[in-house]
Amino acid sequence: AEYDPFHAGHAAHIAATRAAGATHIAVVMSGNFTQRGKPALLPKQRRVAMALKCGADLVIELPLPWAMAPAEVFATGGVSLLQALGCVQVLSFGCECGDAASLQLVASAMDASAYNAALRQAMQAGVSYAAARQTAASVSCGEETAALLAYPNNTLGIEYIRAAARLGAGFDFLGVRRQGAGHHDEAIADGIASGTALR
């Protein structure tokens, strides 16, 4: 998580994780700098206090090299810390689709042998990296499922799943549907503003 800043959607995610049966909730959170390479709006201590007040039991800082990295590296750092705890059974994350099983299909497609060749072919055709990833994943999981990559929280969820597979973490996954405004929306939706709007 980044919690930049902590908002009602983050509180809803923690509550949904608890409602799904979590007896304890450990969060891995970036420190004072975020994936965008910018300082977080609030210091990490304030964001930790908000997370604890809203139901998290433990907040672990994701070290800077992972916190400021692309989704694949960010996810690997977070998953490795949770795995090191030795007690995590379920990895819960927010996502636009709310369906961890569908995200697992995309993750498997991206780890299939045909993926890299299809990715190279799409990149050579001149499409953006994001579009090329989606095209390459569709070879194994179909266009509709691969389209889940078009959404940033889905993409991060997919990278958490891929990291868990690479690291041999035996986690189950809980995808909690994002509530309120979309990731990049600057308007409030259903009483919940995105981090983008708040920043």
Model regions and ranges:
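N-terminal catalytic cores of NTP/NDP-binding nucleotidyl/phosphoryl-transfer enzymes
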Residues: 1-47
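Generic alpha-helix structural propensity
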Residues: 42-46, 54, 69, 73, ...
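Non-catalytic positions within long, well-ordered alpha-helices that form the structural scaffold/packing
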Residues: 18, 52, 83-84
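Short, high-confidence coil segments that cap the C-terminus of an alpha-helix
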Residues: 20-22, 56, 87-88
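Structural preference for beta-strand elements that scaffold enzyme active sites
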Residues: 24-26, 59, 90
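Acidic, Ser/Thr-rich peripheral helices and adjacent loops at domain boundaries
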Residues: 46-49, 114-115
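Active-site cores that bind ATP or allylic diphosphates and position pyrophosphate for catalysis
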Residues: 61-199
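A glycine-rich helix N-cap at a beta->alpha junction
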Residues: 48-64
